[in-house]
């Protein structure tokens, strides 16, 4: 699913506020020194400061890919001739397809089952939305500069990433419309300064290492505090409190009263001691032609192994260490036996599976209780892009008007008309599922009109709604730690149990909720399986590619000790 671009602004605000305090340079001067494009009230001029392009791929990636290809080809023949038993991959989203693809490159056959009648999971591109020629992302949408595993995979598949910053250069990036008026970035940074200092101090108290097995008293105390409680206790303005409520409701998909305060610290405070213009999450890229091309091209390469419309109903551990899976396809129910099973389906869906496998209590608790967001999307069409033509805006809005967050969908489409995505979470994410899409579109349009007067008269076509909480096989948008869940679960989600492996965005240590998280953990699971099969050179080849990516990665969130945790041996076997 899409993640809130507001987080990048808040990270910038935290960093700028801290540097302003350290250096004595006023925040607005620092903004000017950096060439940051400001969000001006109507009628004011705008900065034309250029924003430099960043490299998508870096040195070493091509070499790693070449080595990997040669190794896969060499070991692949060995693996196939050895007649190894099949592996089952449950779920044909980005995690499952990436894992199966990496295994296939090493010559290891894996069956892939998918409960839906299509591949892609929560990556879904809708064509010709609202009567336009423009496609829109109903699920996973944005790719960060630091999402190097996903960018590398897309490049290998012959796909091109579009730089949204370059496409929207010269426009006001974000409009903050609160209490009936626009607020500038300078105002928000000034108000945010006291809270930025508190976040920095609390992050230091959390310590240098963190997992469900290893955490400090300060981490536990903060984990058992909600974001709402944390912010209410802080010395900051009402506007910043409102902005944080909007930011975290859309970012993680649950209301601030439900979320652990560590969600705030590890995301907004990830780079409080550095001075980076965009923070770690810049949501800078989309795939030309739609993100679903990634999963579709993977599926094309695995077409002889994928069974859609096939539901996992149960899994049992047999006395010989193999697994019996109970499957259903239409009216037919049947069992199969596998030596290794990779589960990539969301824990919300795994809760419906009868698991007759001994699981450690922390793993079982995560499966049963891990929070998930209620993020939903409503996409509306317009005959022209008034927000651009008249207001010089990207249509990226954060507001308390009733909707929470909006942006222009697929802004690089070469057409005169346009689409706007209304992105919601928390109680509003659930409420947007009521009535018809047109009912919801009218509510949104009345509110959107207050930000961009005149836009209501340009509405065209039928609205499209993506209501992820109502999807049978996802029941939500993406993982979200609720109060107390960091110290109960962080790190256990991806740990294997015997030859039962786990992947998916919910198992990612640093990219939870992103397409990158699914891609990264699918690769990680493939490496674990290859190592277990004795295909060490193939596993090393995947690791070499990953290492090349890691040298240039910037995780979406930075948790103390996450890289060490990711490199350790699994504690559950």
Where do the model's predicted regions map?
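N-terminal secretory signal peptides
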Residues: 1-51
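C-terminal lid/capping helical subdomain adjacent to the catalytic/cofactor pocket in oxidative enzymes
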Residues: 6, 487-573
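Active-site/ligand-binding neighborhood in enzyme catalytic cores
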Residues: 30-39, 211-314, 329, 337, ...
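N-terminal export signals
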Residues: 38, 44, 48-77
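N-terminal glycine-rich phosphate/pyrophosphate-binding loop and immediately adjacent elements
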Residues: 81-206
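Conserved beta-strand-loop-beta-strand element in the redox core of flavoprotein oxidoreductases
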Residues: 317-334
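C-terminal segments that line or cap access tunnels to active or ligand-binding sites in enzymes
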Residues: 338, 345-475, 545-548
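A glycine-rich dinucleotide-binding beta-alpha-beta segment and adjacent secondary-structure elements
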Residues: 455-507
């Amino acid at each position: 699913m899409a993640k809130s671009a507001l987080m990048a602004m808040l990270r910038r605000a935290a960093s700028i506020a801290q540097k302003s305090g350290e250096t004595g340079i006023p925040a607005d001067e620092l903004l000017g020194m950096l060439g940051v494009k400001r969000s001006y009230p109507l009628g004011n001029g705008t900065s034309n400061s250029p924003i430099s392009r960043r490299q998508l791929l870096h040195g070493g990636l091509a070499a790693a890919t070449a080595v990997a290809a040669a190794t896969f080809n060499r070991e692949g023949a060995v693996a196939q001739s050895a007649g190894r038993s099949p592996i089952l991959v449950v779920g044909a989203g980005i995690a499952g397809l990436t894992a199966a693809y990496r295994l296939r490159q090493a010559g290891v056959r894996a069956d892939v089952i998918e409960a839906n009648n299509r591949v892609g999971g929560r990556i879904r591109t809708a064509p010709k939305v609202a009567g336009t020629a423009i496609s829109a992302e109903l699920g996973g949408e944005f790719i960060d500069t630091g999402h190097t595993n996903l960018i590398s995979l897309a490049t290998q598949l012959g796909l091109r990433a579009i730089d949204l910053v370059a496409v929207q250069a010269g426009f006001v990036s974000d409009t903050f419309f609160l209490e009936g008026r626009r607020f500038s970035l300078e105002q928000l940074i000034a108000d945010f300064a006291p809270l930025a200092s508190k976040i920095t101090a609390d992050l230091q108290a959390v310590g240098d290492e963190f997992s469900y097995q290893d955490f400090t008293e300060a981490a536990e105390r903060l984990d058992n505090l909600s974001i709402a409680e944390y912010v209410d206790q802080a010395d900051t303005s009402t506007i910043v409190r409102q902005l944080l409520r909007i930011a975290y409701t859309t970012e993680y998909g649950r209301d601030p009263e439900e979320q652990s305060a560590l969600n705030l610290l590890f995301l907004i405070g990830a780079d409080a001691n550095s001075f980076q213009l965009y923070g770690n999450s810049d949501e800078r890229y989309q795939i030309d032609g739609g993100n679903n091309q990634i999963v579709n091209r993977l599926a094309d390469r695995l077409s002889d192994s994928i069974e859609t419309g096939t539901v996992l109903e149960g899994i049992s551990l047999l006395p010989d260490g193999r697994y019996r899976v109970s499957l259903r396809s239409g009216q037919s129910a049947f069992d199969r036996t596998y030596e290794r099973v990779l589960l990539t389906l969301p824990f919300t869906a795994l809760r419906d599976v009868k698991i007759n496998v001994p699981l450690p209590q922390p793993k079982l608790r995560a499966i049963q209780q891990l929070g998930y967001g209620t993020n939903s999307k409503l996409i509306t069409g317009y005959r022209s892009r008034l927000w651009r033509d008249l207001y010089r805006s990207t249509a990226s809005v954060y507001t308390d008007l009733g909707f929470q967050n909006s942006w222009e969908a697929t802004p690089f489409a070469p057409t005169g008309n346009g689409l706007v995505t209304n992105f919601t979470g928390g109680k509003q994410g659930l409420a947007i599922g009521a009535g018809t899409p047109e009912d919801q579109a009218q509510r949104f349009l009345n509110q959107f009109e207050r930000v961009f007067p005149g836009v209501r008269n340009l509405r065209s076509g039928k609205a499209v709604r993506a209501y992820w909480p109502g999807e049978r096989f996802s029941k939500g948008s993406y993982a979200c730690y609720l109060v107390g869940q960091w110290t109960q679960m962080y790190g256990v989600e991806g740990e294997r149990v015997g030859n039962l492996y786990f992947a998916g965005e919910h198992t990612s240590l640093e990219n939870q909720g992103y397409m990158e998280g699914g891609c990264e953990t699918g690769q990680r699971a493939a490496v674990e399986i290859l190592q277990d099969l004795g295909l060490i050179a193939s596993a090393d080849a995947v690791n070499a590619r990953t290492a090349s990516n890691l040298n240039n990665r910037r995780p979406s969130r930075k948790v103390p000790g996450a890289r060490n945790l990711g490199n350790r041996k699994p504690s559950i076997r």
